[in-house]
Curated annotation (Swiss-Prot):
It comes from the Bacteria. Keywords: Cytoplasm, GTP-binding, Ligase, Magnesium, Metal-binding, Nucleotide-binding, Purine biosynthesis. Mg(2+) binds at residues 12, 39. Plays an important role in the de novo pathway of purine nucleotide biosynthesis. Catalyzes the first committed step in the biosynthesis of AMP from IMP. InterPro entries: Adenylosuccin_syn_GTP-bd (IPR018220), Adenylosuccin_syn_Lys_AS (IPR033128), Adenylosuccinate_synth_dom1 (IPR042109), Adenylosuccinate_synth_dom2 (IPR042110), Adenylosuccinate_synth_dom3 (IPR042111), Adenylosuccinate_synthetase (IPR001114), P-loop_NTPase (IPR027417). The gene is purA. HAMAP family: Adenylosucc_synth. Its EC number is 6.3.4.4. Binds 1 Mg(2+) ion per subunit. One of its GO terms (biological process) is IMP metabolic process. Pathway: Purine metabolism; AMP biosynthesis via de novo pathway; AMP from IMP: step 1/2. SUPFAM superfamilies: P-loop containing nucleoside triphosphate hydrolases. GO terms for molecular function: adenylosuccinate synthase activity; GTP binding; magnesium ion binding. This is Adenylosuccinate synthetase.
């Protein structure tokens, strides 16, 4: 059976800590979408680990880790991550169906961002997915056969010829790209496997599989705040498509949310707080992107968005992260509905334009940091937790009270 860990905001919810906290109980941990535009930060024994492509189970020696087919892979960045760990042989596997991000993709991404202003990381994620959908991409499995790779590269060079100058690729692009693959393919090829068959077999054997997503539900290409979204499907449903596991294999869906809201990049954010309180949340919560170091926009918890995300993912339980960041705040707001042109909205619309938050205010608490038992939380903190649980209609199974793995309340 497989369990899914999915972000139910705009990403950066703390999925890495949760996966790291529970990964020891699983045989496989699988990253199922996105690219190195996303990042997990894990604090283990006082040491901070920033992961961009590697599944969070790499810190457990007995855990097998898979990068599955819907992930787009920068071989350079993956090689750099691999070099930071030891003994990954027979513990890390990259799907032969996953698509390869080329240096050209990053150049195209940066070029398009100048006019579109979406707020992308300019890592080449979107253009790589474009080539995938156009059936012209290079897959990880192509790196295993020099002849096939050469054919794919020649087709790529022909396709981009009209755009080389616009994207600033330079006269030596073809030579440089061949050298690029020569440098990194040798390092990455031992990890490339048919992970789809591997996971199907593992599921049939009854092995435990944990599927972790990147970004968050509200960035989903189809169901998020379009066009300010990522280029992949970020919901729990995409875990099946990417891994080859059928929907019957899914057991628990754990939705991850912060006790407040953040968003990086452009796009609508109804509960954003543009006052010094937003700055306080950013500073205390260390809200800076793992990948880009960009400051995250901060605001209050949005229950309209949270209910929507829980429904989309079929969440069976929630993990409430960073409760301690709200410590010491006298009045804590929660967005319970939107108002748009005089109309109250309680359902999440396809377009958030002109949506203003309707807040309910709660009394704050002094301290929750480091608490590991529910009964040790102050009454106001417990009331806040129970209100969220009641309004969303999904059990909160875990509360995080600091970045440390052990500072976790299990309910």
């Amino acid at each position: 059976m497989a369990d899914v860990v999915v972000g139910i905001q705009w990403g950066d919810e703390g999925k890495g800590k949760i996966v790291d906290r529970i990964a020891k109980d699983y045989d496989f941990v699988v990253r199922y979408q996105g690219g190195h535009n996303a990042g997990h930060t894990i604090v283990h024994k006082g040491v901070k680990h920033s992961l961009h492509l590697m599944p969070s189970g790499v810190l457990y020696p007995k855990c097998k880790n898979i990068i599955s087919s819907a992930v787009v892979v920068s071989v350079k960045d993956l090689c750099e991550e691999i070099s930071a760990f030891e003994d990954l042989e027979n513990r890390l596997f990259v799907s032969d169906r996953a698509h390869v991000i080329l240096p050209y993709h990053a150049k195209k991404d940066a070029f398009k961002e100048k006019s579109q202003n979406i707020g992308t990381t300019k890592k080449g994620i979107g253009p790589c997915y474009e080539d995938k959908m156009a059936r012209s991409g290079i897959r990880m499995g192509d790196l295993l056969d020099d002849k096939i790779l050469e054919e794919k590269l020649n087709a790529h060079f022909k396709a981009i010829e009209p755009f080389k100058e616009a994207y600033g690729l330079g006269e030596n692009y073809e030579k440089d790209l061949r050298e690029y693959f020569k440098t990194y393919a040798k390092k990455i090829c031992p990890f490339i496997k048919d992970t789809t068959s591997m996971l199907i077999e593992a599921n049939q054997k009854g092995e435990k599989i944990l599927l972790e997503g990147a970004q968050g539900t509200l960035l989903d290409i189809d169901l998020g705040t379009y066009p300010f979204v990522t280029s992949s499907n970020t919901t729990s449903a995409s875990a099946c498509v990417s891994t080859g596991l059928n929907p019957k294999a899914i057991n628990e869906v754990i939705g991850i949310t912060k006790a407040y809201s953040t968003r990086v990049g452009n796009g609508p954010f109804p509960s954003e707080d543009a006052t010094p309180m937003g700055d306080h949340l950013r500073t205390k919560g260390a809200e800076f992107g793992t990948t880009t170091k960009r400051p995250r926009r901060c605001g209050w918890l949005d229950l309209v968005a949270l209910k929507y995300a829980c429904a989309l993912n079929g969440c069976t339980q929630l993990a409430l992260m960073k409760l301690d960041v709200l410590d010491g705040i006298d009045a804590i707001k929660v967005c319970v509905a939107y108002e748009r042109k005089g109309e109250r909205l309680e359902a999440f619309p396809s377009d958030l334009k002109d949506c203003m938050p309707i807040y309910q205010t709660f009394k704050g608490w002094e301290k929750s940091v480091g608490v590991r038992k529910l009964e040790d939380l102050e009454p106001n903190a417990r009331e806040y937790v129970r209100f969220i649980e009641k309004e969303v209609g999904v059990k909160i199974g875990l509360i995080s009270t600091s970045p440390e793995r052990e500072d976790t309340i299990f309910l």
